[in-house]
Amino acid sequence: MNRTSTLLSCLILKYERVKAPQKKQVVVLILLFIASGTRAQFYKDMSVGINGGIYVYQGDLTPDPMGSFKTIKPGLSLFAKKPINYFLAARLHMSFASLQGDDSRYSKPDYRQQRNFYFYSPLMEFSGQLVWNIRGRNYDDYGIQPYVFTGAGVSFIRVNKNYSRMNTAYFGETSDVYTGLVADNAHGTPRALLSVPVGVGAEYPLSERFSLNIETSYRFIFTDYLDGFSQAANQKLKDHYHSTAIGLIYKFGVKKKGLGCPSVN
C-alpha cells in the first residue's frame, strides 16, 4: 500500500471510531488531505531549471549563413517541465537575452564596410513547448537522456538600428540601398514576434534531484525586420536567431518514508 492510500485509510479508520461531534473535524481533515494530495501529485516529477548561453543573430547584417558569431550575446533562461508520459513532456520556457548585427565586422564582400549598418535589440521570449525524450526516460534518474523539442511563443524586441555610418557617396542617393532605407524607415520595426523554437538537447542526471542539461534551439520568426533592415539589405531572406545553452535542472518529488501508521488489510 502506498503512502497516500495508507494515510487516507488511517483517516477513514479514525472517522469510523470517533464520536459524532468529532466526525466533522475528521471530514475536514480528509478534505484537506485530498486537496494537498492532489497538489502534491501535480508537482510530482515536475522539474525546474536555469541555463545560460549564447544568442546568435542570423540575418542581413552577416554574410555567414550560420549567423553572426562575431556579435554573439549572452542570455539566461528559466523553465519548468512536467512529464506527460515516458516520452513526452510539456515545458514552459522564458528567456532574457539580446541580439546584435554589425556590417563593419566583416570585410567581405567589400560593400559591407561601406554600408556599415548596425542594430542591437534586447530580447525577452516566452514559449510553450513539447519535449520528446528519445529514450523514453522521463521518470528515470540515470543515463544520458537526449531529447528534441518544438513549440510556439512570442519574442519581444526593441530594435535600435543605425545607418549613420553609411558611405552615401559610395552608393549614391539613387541606389537600391538608399531607396530601400526610405522604405524601411516608413515600415518601422516590430515589438512582438511570433516565434517557433525547434531544438535538440540532452540531460545527464547527477542525482535523484539534479541534472545537467545542454541544448541548442533555432527560432523561426517569420519577419525580415528583426534587425530593422529589409529592402535596404536582402528582402528575399527572413531573419532568425538561435542559441546554445548549458544549465542545471531540479526535479521535485517526495521520497517514500515510513509513516508510523499501520496498514489496513
For the regions a language model picked out, list residue spans one by one.
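N-terminal signal peptide c-region/cleavage motif recognized by signal peptidases
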Residues: 35-37
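Extracellular loop and loop/strand-boundary signature of outer-membrane beta-barrel proteins
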Residues: 60-66, 111-119, 135, 183-188, ...
